[in-house]
Amino acid sequence: MHILKEPDLNDPKLRAKLAKGMGHNYYGEPAWPNDLLYIFPVVILGTIACVVALAVLDPAMLADKADPFATPLEILPEWYLYPVFQILRVVPNKLLGIALQTMIPLGLMLVPFIESFNKFQNPFRRPVAMAVFLFGTAFTIYLGIGAALPIDKSLTLGLF
C-alpha cells in the first residue's frame, strides 16, 4: 500500500500543465550565471584585497633570527600541548604522570555510566556530565596557563 500518490503521466491535463512549465519552481535566483559569474568573483577578489591590504599596511614582524648557539632558558612545546606538558613537569614520578594522562580518557568514558539519562534529554540538565565538563575545561586552562610560567610559579600561577 503506497502512502504517496504517484502522478499519472498519461493524464492529458497533467501533460498540458507540464508542457507549459508548471510543476517547476521558478522563484528565487538561479545560481548560473548570477552567483558563479558575479557574486563569487567579487567575494574572492575582496578577500584577496583584504589580505594584501593587511600584509602591506600592517606587516607581521618576524621573530629574532635563529641562533644555534643560544639555547632558550626553557623550551616549551606547542600551545595545545601545554596542559600535558604541565602534568609531566609537575608530577615527580614520570610513570605517575603517564598514568594520570591515561586516566583522563578512562574517566571521561565512565561519565555516561555514572549518570542515567534519556538520550533525547537536554544536555544542560545532566548535572554530572556538565560538572565534569566544566571542571575539566577549567582545569585544562589552569594547566595551560601554568605551563607557560616558570616551574616555581606554575602551580600558583604566580598569585601567591
UniProtKB/Swiss-Prot annotation:
Q: TM spans, by residue?
A: 36-56, 95-115, 131-151
GO CC terms of this entry? plasma membrane-derived thylakoid membrane
Q: Which InterPro entries match?
A: Cyt_b/b6_C, Cyt_b/b6_C_sf, Cyt_b6/f_cplx_suIV, Cytochrome_b_C_euk/bac
SUPFAM superfamilies xrefs: a domain/subunit of cytochrome bc1 complex (Ubiquinol-cytochrome c reductase)
The cellular location(s) given in this protein's UniProt record come to: Cellular thylakoid membrane
Q: Major place of localization? A: membrane
Family recorded in the similarity comment: Belongs to the cytochrome b family. PetD subfamily.
Known function: Component of the cytochrome b6-f complex, which mediates electron transfer between photosystem II (PSII) and photosystem I (PSI), cyclic electron flow around PSI, and state transitions.
* HAMAP family, per database record: Cytb6_f_subIV
PANTHER family on file: CYTOCHROME B, CYTOCHROME B_B6 C-TERMINAL REGION PROFILE DOMAIN-CONTAINING PROTEIN
UniProt protein name:
Cytochrome b6-f complex subunit 4
Q: Which source organism?
A: Synechococcus sp. (strain RCC307)
Q: What gene codes for this chain?
A: petD
